[in-house]
Design a protein with these regions (language model features):
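Residue-level signature of the cytosolic catalytic core of signaling kinases
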Residues: 179, 233-237, 295, 345
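N-terminal Rossmann-like NAD(P)+-binding domain of SDR-like oxidoreductases, especially those catalyzing
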Residues: 1-217
Length: 376
């Protein structure tokens, strides 16, 4: 098994959990993170619902768990320093999680949109070129988003490439059409097409994961170590389930955008890491495009689940600040790749919601009023 792995964005919500899983399974892990996310969070007054360790404290803890090296590098800018890392380590796998993770943040203004596209796209290009130069047989995994699709496209969303027909002629396999929901999602689409170029030009092996909304705070490794990821609950960086739970804990109504019929794919943090491990352990032979989710819910269904667990919770409908359809629509996503590798959902949304209510201390939360970024 290939055991030499680089995790870019190792301090993030997914990266922190993935590093601990890899170390537990005896991988040699090189973590790269320049901690710029702390600046984004501070700018938006986004505090964690849980205490988190500093990077130095994490590094010390990770090195006690296993073989771990850490580099403070901006992969979108510091090409020479990134090159030195690739020279020093013969990577088998690179997992790129080093992207600004918020659609609302990318919509704040021109500067934030421009920054998001540069930060999230150039990192992919730099990694791919350095793989070509120093580890051409390695496998890169990137987390993209189900939000790169038109959610209301009214057909099954496939995996891989597809062929289309027009006037009796069939095309060569193509990437399924995308329709970004934000500038953040546009940058995700860019990264996918860059990896497609690298496969066609150089034979680079890659897995592009279109992931649903992730919720939850624990994995078995986090439960053992107590080293939590940043749990955002503001409207800019907090994801739907996590944000609703914390709103309830602060005795605030859960804010539903529009009529709440927006359907999305969801999976727990633990299942997201399970999926990543499956793709690490089963590298692609060329370019692999997969969808990653466990269940599909609309917002109203999630609200109802939380209200069953906490009957005192309330909700309100507000005009959606986003440019999205809030009407009911057909939503069916193919997830055959995960099934072929034996993926099984390990944590229900009910269990994970109950767990967050038990673990998070309400007195630790920031009670300042939320601010909403307007798309239009």
């Amino acid at each position: 098994m290939n055991k030499n792995i680089c995790v870019c964005g190792c301090n993030g919500y997914l990266g922190n959990a993935l590093v601990q899983r890899l170390l537990k399974q005896n991988y040699f892990v090189v973590g790269i993170d320049n901690d710029v996310k702390l600046e984004w969070l501070d700018e938006c007054n986004s505090v964690s619902a849980l205490p988190i360790l500093s990077t130095l404290e994490k590094c010390r803890s990770f090195r006690k768990m296993g073989k771990y090296a850490h580099y403070n590098i901006d992969i979108s800018k510091d090409i020479n320093r990134l090159r030195e890392v690739f020279k020093a380590h013969n990577f088998d796998t690179i997992v790129n999680l080093a992207q600004m993770p918020s659609a609302p943040y990318s919509q704040i203004d021109l500067e934030h949109a421009s920054y998001t596209i540069q930060n999230n796209s150039l990192g992919t290009v730099h990694i791919a070129w350095l793989m070509k130069e120093y580890c051409p047989d390695a496998h890169i995994i990137e987390i993209e988003s189900m939000g790169t699709y038109n959610h209301a496209i009214n057909t099954e969303i496939p995996e891989g490439k597809f062929t289309f027909e027009r006037k009796g002629r069939s095309s060569e396999p193509c990437i399924f059409p995308r329709q970004a929901g934000s500038f953040y999602h546009s940058a995700k689409i860019n990264s996918m097409y860059f990896l497609d170029c690298c496969q066609r030009f150089w034979g680079l092996k890659s897995t592009t994961i279109n992931q649903g909304v992730v919720f939850g705070i624990t994995t078995p490794e986090i439960e053992e170590s107590g080293i939590y990821s940043h749990l955002a609950y503001d409207s800019t960086f907090g994801t739907a389930v996590n944000r609703f739970i914390i709103q309830t804990m602060m005795d605030r109504p859960m804010t539903i955008y529009g009529n709440g019929n927006q359907k999305r794919g969801y999976l727990s943090l633990n299942d997201s890491i399970q999926c990543l491990m499956l793709f690490i352990e089963n590298p692609a032979n060329d370019m692999r495009i997969v969808n990653q989710l466990a269940d599909v819910y609309n917002i109203n269904q999630i609200i109802d689940i939380i209200k069953k667990i906490k009957p005192e919770s309330t909700s309100i409908n507000m005009k959606s600040p986003r440019a999205e359809t809030t009407d009911d629509f057909y939503y069916n996503v193919c997830t055959d790749a995960l099934k072929s590798f034996g993926f099984k959902n390990t944590r229900t949304i009910e269990d994970e919601i109950s767990s967050i209510f038990k673990i998070v201390d309400p007195d630790y939360l920031n009670k300042e009023q939320e601010k909403f970024v307007q798309w239009k």
